[in-house]
Amino acid sequence: MADTQYILPNDIGVSSLDCREAFRLLSPTERLYAHHLSRAAWYGGLAVLLQTSPEAPYIYALLSRLFRAQDPDQLRQHALAEGLTEEEYQAFLVYAAGVYSNMGNYKSFGDTKFVPNLPKDKLGRVILGSKAAQQRPEEVRDLWQTCGDLMFSLEPRLRHLGLGKEGVTTYFSGDCTMEDAKLAQDFLDSQNLSAYNTRLFKVVGQEGKSHYEVRLASVLNTDPALDSELTSKLKRYEFQGNHFQVTRGDYAPILQKVVEHLEKAKAYAANSHQEQMLAQYVESFTQGSIEAHKRGSRFWIQDKGPIVESYIGFIESYRDPFGSRGEFEGFVAMVNKAMSAKFERLVASAEQLLKELPWPLAFEKDKFLTPDFTSLDVLTFAGSGIPAGINIPNYDDLRQTEGFKNVSLGNVLAVAYAAKREKLTFLEEEDKDLYIRWKGPSFDVQVGLHELLGHGSGKLFVQDEKGAFNFDKETVINPETGEQIQSWYRSGETWDSKFSTIASSYEECRAESVGLYLCLNPQVLEIFGFEGADAEDVIYVNWLNMVRAGLLALEFYTPEAANWRQAHMQARFVILRVLLEAGEGLVTVTPTTGSDGRPDARVRLDRSKIRSVGRPALERFLRRLQVLKSTGDVVAGRALYEGYAAVTDAPPECFLTLRDTVLLRKESRKLIVQPNTRLEGSEVQLVEYEASAAGLIRSFCERFPEDGPELEEVLIQLAAADARFWRNQAQEAPPGQA
């Protein structure tokens, strides 16, 4: 059997997303709006398969054909007859559910490959003897031959997502390196093109020169007759001695489906903001224009407090090894009014609370743009995973001048972050009951502060294309050096493009730190309804949760490559290091032996020292993070962040050794089963599924009732068209991992 790092256990937690009550309260028109937006999101989410690994689209197509012909119960009888045990068949169901849940065969949280936990020959017998194989023998056999080996392979280079010899990514062709990624970013900056909706393909010509294709995601291809703001950029370029060509049409048939349902949703929009937003999204996905998506996002920001909230596009750049390309995601959700009222009170206090942050006013935005902050019950979240909260859009220029929205996903928090006592690792017994009682409420506070005042705070110092500065060069002083500002962002540079590989994690660390820092404020806790001893418990559990998460984070560190695979977890480890460095017994991490005789560890936080020792340490660290971000000082920012993020076996903590303990006692993230919406006549029905691997599989089998087989064919064709870019990738192992 495979290494436990690379399998999903048979007893993995599976929860259903509950949005029945929120959906019931929608009007018929709102339901139709939500339905078509959900359809657009689910179709678009299929692009994630093509953004993950070369084999993911084939695995998805194979599983879908298998379970369409026989549902999980019917296939079980066949599998047992073929000699599988109940445990082996369950392992296959869990694997299939994992592929659907992550939209690929790499975990969305941690970027680690997962493989089926049963022998390959047994699974092969089940697949080749299945009803699907009887109906279409050649197709099923070809799919199994194409993806069977890769499905199971744990060749060193295939274990994690990464660039070059560090791993697998389909944002770049297999021979691209970090140097190619940097060169491409310089090229994109020179043409004022965003990387968000692009992939990079490299071919080395006979003359030894590299030829790069920058391919934009769009319905349209490169036909110059189809004029748009982008047409002039679709051509060949010479750049620093290399050939570049900008093309478009990536994921075209998938995005065509997205556009069709966005057009249908427009008929049920509640106001002109929503209509104009959808029109711009249609333009963006049709043409491949990020500028159109920005315009749509501007209307989205202006659409305050809608009953049905949604966002769709190439959004988060966590999984691009370079940190610039966005993964497709789309969500549709309904407002939870009671919780939203608390967040609205937090927004009302935000301007006052921003002044509490530990940097000078010159480092804060010139004007606080009052954002929307709602608690939502998710109906649909298509992509590779579901977060607990979101602060979007990610476009720096919009965030600085137009604002943003914050959302907390209430029904996701309710199921994904629920804690069971027996599963609580690394805590003292006396902390466990307190932790269970206050984990949920403290996390609501942390998510609120993290999104609104973490991601929502801070100014970037920019010099525009005309040479004008958005800060006073003569009077603004760097509080870390006592001198005038020496560095800033030039026109075309963004936070992501400048800080690239550390940008996501650094920003998550800044937002998490703001949450810890401001949760000490009594006014914040009163907003959420906590006073006195309860307020102190919320603070303690919030800080305790963070330092425990810092230890759990070691699961997401790869020692062989000395890199982190998950931005949020790296951020939490950095915060743990900062609080350990503060000393005075504030935080201790001690190796122990568990009651089962195996290695264990205990995290302790001295609650009497949170304000006296923890707060000043966090204050100093937060100020440095913000100053280096504002000034675009990537050299000092990288040195600071990577210094704290380094994992060594230096005493007293011996983190590399502790990592083995963390892996020994790790718990897999829950899989979440989402409902479907179904149009029956003019009415939209909500279809729910049981909380099990089989239920999750059924939800996906019923997700595309009109065109499932056609979509699988499209995915196979799109994957096959680019397959040459990743041939022979597995054989090249990274150094030290052969």
From Swiss-Prot:
Group of enzyme by EC: hydrolase
Gene Ontology terms: biological process: proteolysis
Subcellular location: Cytoplasm, Cytosol
Cellular component annotations (GO), alphabetically ordered: cytosol
Chief location of this protein within or outside the cell: cytoplasm
InterPro entries: Dipeptidyl-peptase3 (IPR005317), Peptidase_M49 (IPR039461)
Key words of the record: Acetylation, Aminopeptidase, Cytoplasm, Hydrolase, Metal-binding, Metalloprotease, Protease, Zinc
Catalytic activity: Release of an N-terminal dipeptide from a peptide comprising four or more residues, with broad specificity. Also acts on dipeptidyl 2-naphthylamides
Binding site for Zn(2+): 450, 455, 508
Cysteines paired by S-S bonds: none
Cofactor: record remark: Binds 1 zinc ion per subunit.
Pfam families (UniProt xref): Peptidase_M49
EC number: 3.4.14.4
Co-factor requirement: Zn(2+)
Catalytic residues (positions): 451
Gene Ontology MF, one: zinc ion binding
Gene3D superfamilies: 3.30.540.30
Modified sites of kind N-acetylalanine: 2
Function of the protein: Cleaves and degrades bioactive peptides, including angiotensin, Leu-enkephalin and Met-enkephalin. Also cleaves Arg-Arg-beta-naphthylamide (in vitro).
Family, per entry: Belongs to the peptidase M49 family.
UniProt protein name: Dipeptidyl peptidase 3
Organism from which the protein derives: Mus musculus
Annotated gene: Dpp3
